[in-house]
Amino acid sequence: MGDMTNSDFYSKNQRNESSHGGEFGCSMEELRSLMELRGTEAVVKIKETYGDTESICRRLKTSPVEGLPGTAPDLEKRKQIFGQNFIPPKKPKTFLQLVWEALQDVTLIILEIAAIISLGLSFYHPPGESNEGCATAQGGAEDEGEAEAGWIEGAAILLSVICVVLVTAFNDWSKEKQFRGLQSRIEQEQKFTVVRAGQVVQIPVAEIVVGDIAQIKYGDLLPADGLFIQGNDLKIDESSLTGESDQVRKSVDKDPMLLSGTHVMEGSGRMVVTAVGVNSQTGIIFTLLGAGGEEEEKKDKKGVKKGDGLQLPAADGAAPANAAGSANASLVNGKMQDGSADSSQSKAKQQDGAAAMEMQPLKSAEGGDADDKKKANMHKKEKSVLQGKLTKLAVQIGKAGLVMSAITVIILVLYFTVDTFVVNKKPWLTECTPVYVQYFVKFFIIGVTVLVVAVPEGLPLAVTISLAYSVKKMMKDNNLVRHLDACETMGNATAICSDKTGTLTTNRMTVVQAYVGDVHYKEIPDPSSINAKTLELLVNAIAINSAYTTKILPPEKEGALPRQVGNKTECGLLGFVLDLRQDYEPVRSQMPEEKLYKVYTFNSVRKSMSTVIKMPDESFRMYSKGASEIVLKKCCKILSGAGEPRVFRPRDRDEMVKKVIEPMACDGLRTICVAYRDFPSSPEPDWDNENDILNELTCICVVGIEDPVRPEVPEAIRKCQRAGITVRMVTGDNINTARAIAIKCGIIHPGEDFLCLEGKEFNRRIRNEKGEIEQERIDKIWPKLRVLARSSPTDKHTLVKGIIDSTHTEQRQVVAVTGDGTNDGPALKKADVGFAMGIAGTDVAKEASDIILTDDNFSSIVKAVMWGRNVYDSISKFLQFQLTVNVVAVIVAFTGACITQDSPLKAVQMLWVNLIMDTFASLALATEPPTETLLLRKPYGRNKPLISRTMMKNILGHAVYQLTLIFTLLFVGEKMFQIDSGRNAPLHSPPSEHYTIIFNTFVMMQLFNEINARKIHGERNVFDGIFRNPIFCTIVLGTFAIQIVIVQFGGKPFSCSPLQLDQWMWCIFIGLGELVWGQVIATIPTSRLKFLKEAGRLTQKEEIPEEELNEDVEEIDHAERELRRGQILWFRGLNRIQTQIRVVKAFRSSLYEGLEKPESRTSIHNFMAHPEFRIEDSQPHIPLIDDTDLEEDAALKQNSSPPSSLNKNNSAIDSGINLTTDTSKSATSSSPGSPIHSLETSL
């Protein structure tokens, strides 16, 4: 292995070498084509062309043991010849493209057309213009100045449209910039372990080069293609590339091909990297799918943006912004536009789809499948709670606005026609046609104006701004948000199911008690008190039977604790060896990893890890370790104080459990048993017969490992409980350990009525005689359940699903889950919000999550709750403000137009009002910082309407005040101010003071009402904390300043006539009245106003159709996109699509239905079945025959059958998430590293 440039080798293989001009023994193309082969085909090819994997290492000038030398010139050369492990992201949209997108907005287009017609007509002077018949219709002769007004109005509308477009585009641009920043942050955080110059180092995924020796372990997502060179029991889930859900066992002689984007489900090993970036299998797929991204762009621009329309659902049902779609567009005619929807969302739509993938350094390629990913995002959850409510509300408002504007136009046209041609009996003269048309255009503009004000296009903007602002700030609080909507959902959380290890505890394991040689030591024993033979066995057992990647390194700083690298439980055991003043390194160098004869890696069926070595006398010895209650059952002997094995009977075991294990557990310790067994050299045992091998062990010792509770956790849990959130602990530890820790954390308090169950008991209680899970049974348990111990990932998933699906309480539950192991994927996906651990979490867990806790700390979850509630409140504040403006403006424009034949608020003024109430108000109200007081109230829950009765009271109360004053001004204002009336003015008359006062008063009332809108729970002090929000103050003052300019100098474009000081004072005084009136409204008890209805409530049934529709559209979209791409991956693509469609259908039927014999193990099943060797996970995983196994197949057989009754109201959720249960294979497989995918998609 050692000599990399082996001369014999070269001479022998000269013929193969001659064709390579490069410095390496094989070219990029050869390696690339080699990696496209599978199984035996690949083995044959390697043998024929290269000899074996070692020769490939030599050609690549690398050593399987030492790795690359790691010198800068060498790495650089490799990058040049073989490429970098990076798939270039798609170029961000330019500002102009964003402007173009913003222009796609339907209402804006209508306004532009109307303005252009109006402009055109104002320049067209027909010969009959002086005709008297027309003149009457025009309301008398015009002077020169008035004739100009026609074009001024048209130009002003165009100008304001440009303003709106620029503001929208700027918002999108800054948002996109922010997310790219977030993306690069996520990229940097992803590292992989490689061997360089004999040292094991972690390097960013983008730095991996061809020839690197990468160490792979359970839970990894492979960042590049490579050849397996050595390892134990390695099983890979390749479903992300092949669509096959079975795990593939890898071995040097049968199938050494390891592909990027696939998951390590079990075992560990080393591989030599053979292809990176665009040349890896995933990279090739992305390149094909993206077709360089360019074609996609062109295609998307054609026609009705077919892609966009279809992809909208794909952009994550949960995307707040695309919630109200691009509100105006989507609302006006249901046609989804990119318009004012976030560009980053539309960008994500194109990229995230099977389109030009926005690929981060390979990690996102690791994603395997873009489409799987997209699918996963889309079905991630039922629509984000808030978003579902917003969409519904926005659609309702949009429809109402459309009806109102249509009626306005019809009434105006009828009134004009009847008045002109019937009452005044005017004939229709051809020369008058342009004049009449001008009238109709004016009416049309008024109609569109009503619509513009009615449609709340600020909603998606408010949501986006609020979320983007929160996400940015949450990064400082150690919450890396991957799906934007998760941030808002978190505010509604009613339950948190948390892991113990690493989240509630520090995940720094130390052995504090031990039972060795018949003595129970309450602290680390002195090595001299342990028999030398026993001590040697103990050191060998721990050193050899632990992953060789697990190490204890010297502390980084003077006086700090030693660094623990690798599996924390094993670190604790190695620390124990060091505490016994022994050294594990010499043992490992004597018995290197390559010499290990057989390794039974930890998995959830074995719940232990065992390693077989060959002794000098050719016999075999197996070392074993695992959860004490599991391993002790397999022991028939135990080492005595003299170091001799003596018989260990079941009754001895029971006594040991009582006297040693239970007391340790009650101290909150995890107990691990270390054992061994000797085998004769002949006959050689049948190593595949595990039941015989992993039996008749001899116990060496039992140790108690402490994992202390994080100091800040009890306070954080107290805050959650005060905020009405129930915290449950789900752990693999035994019940006594779990209960002890739960009491320390404050999850349970002695004397309370609560349940602590073990996984087995939990399953017994929730299943009927047939072994099926029943929702009613779960409903009896979950309200009191606080600790679920010895639980398998399936149990965790079952619990989360049970709580989410429960209709047992009035408020449906919103559940957050934390997880770090690969097997937590399903539960993380099922939960409303999944938190993955940034430090201890596996790639798979991170990929399945919505938020990554960068410090693995539970108290960061409390911050997320605070931010989430703040988002919800910000949006409610904005709604309260916006709806008041909407109601008033629409009624004023409608009534005014119908009674006076002209809207008191002109088109350009309305656009200005629209700008302040939408864009500026959303900025002002959506950026309120959160306060601790948010944690003093109960969560809203899933069914709470968006607009509470208090808010409805505020909206109607303020609308009544505003309408009363505006109509008073409209009909008697001219008498009050002794000015000319502005009613019934002729077509191009100059702006009147009368209407200017109405406009100014209207804006002043909105400004002061914006201050009222800061409080939505009926608080009296609306100024509380106003100076903590500089953005709010700036916007209110800025709007006021611009209003002065518009009124005093706006002139004809804004239809404004300058006002005198006393008129200004009246306008401001009426505006200030809003604040006083606000106090009056606050005094009225909401409970008395029974007639008030809430709005924006989401009933469970409404969650369904949208989602199912999404699925269908999504499938069509997939297929279309896939089939249009190059033929090379035709079959693979097809295969993948079929799998996905199958999966969607399969999981649409209830998760726990149909328990037929599985025909294949779905990957999620395996997924759940293999925790890392962390004993907290050494769960008695009930052999997972129950649910997940069968879902795919069982459901396939019954995909026509309706979902089980317990899910009737929830099939949306089910289809969404059960899909995700399986997408743990696809979604998780799909770009782990690219949370940003998901992030953008969900924007």
Swiss-Prot record:
It is a multi-pass membrane protein. Residues 1141-1150 are annotated as: Calmodulin-binding subdomain B. Residues 116-152, 411-443, 896-905, 970-987, 1051-1060 are extracellular. Residues 296-308 have a biased composition (Basic and acidic residues). The chain crosses the membrane at residues 95-115, 153-173, 391-410, 444-461, 876-895, 906-926, 947-969, 988-1009, 1029-1050, 1061-1082. Isoforms containing segment B are found in brain, uterus, liver and kidney and in low levels in other tissues. Isoforms containing segment W are found in kidney, uterus, and pancreas. Isoforms containing segment Y are found in pancreas and in low levels in brain and heart. Isoforms containing segment Z are found in brain and heart and isoforms containing segment X are found in low levels in brain. Isoforms containing segment A are found in low levels in heart and small intestine while isoforms containing segment C are found in testis and in low levels in other tissues. Its main location: membrane. GO terms for molecular function: ATP binding; ATP hydrolysis activity; calcium ion binding; calcium-dependent ATPase activity; calmodulin binding; glutamate receptor binding; metal ion binding; P-type calcium transporter activity. The modification Phosphoserine is found at residues 18, 27, 1178, 1201, 1211. It is an enzyme of class 7 (translocase). The active site is at residue 499. Residues 313-330, 337-356, 1196-1211, 1220-1234 have a biased composition (Low complexity). Its EC number is 7.2.2.10. It holds the Pfam family Hydrolase. GO terms for cellular component: apical plasma membrane; basolateral plasma membrane; cilium; cytoplasm; dendrite; dendritic spine membrane; endoplasmic reticulum; GABA-ergic synapse. Keywords: ATP-binding, Calcium, Calcium transport, Calmodulin-binding, Cell membrane, Ion transport, Magnesium, Membrane, Metal-binding, Nucleotide-binding, Phosphoprotein, Synapse, Translocase, Transmembrane, Transmembrane helix, Transport. Signal peptide: none annotated. The modification Phosphothreonine is found at residues 1139, 1188. It comes from the Eukaryota. Interacts with PDZD11. ATP-driven Ca(2+) ion pump involved in the maintenance of basal intracellular Ca(2+) levels in specialized cells of cerebellar circuit and vestibular and cochlear systems. Uses ATP as an energy source to transport cytosolic Ca(2+) ions across the plasma membrane to the extracellular compartment. Has fast activation and Ca(2+) clearance rate suited to control fast neuronal Ca(2+) dynamics. At parallel fiber to Purkinje neuron synapse, mediates presynaptic Ca(2+) efflux in response to climbing fiber-induced Ca(2+) rise. Belongs to the cation transport ATPase (P-type) (TC 3.A.3) family. Type IIB subfamily. This is Plasma membrane calcium-transporting ATPase 2. The gene is Atp2b2.
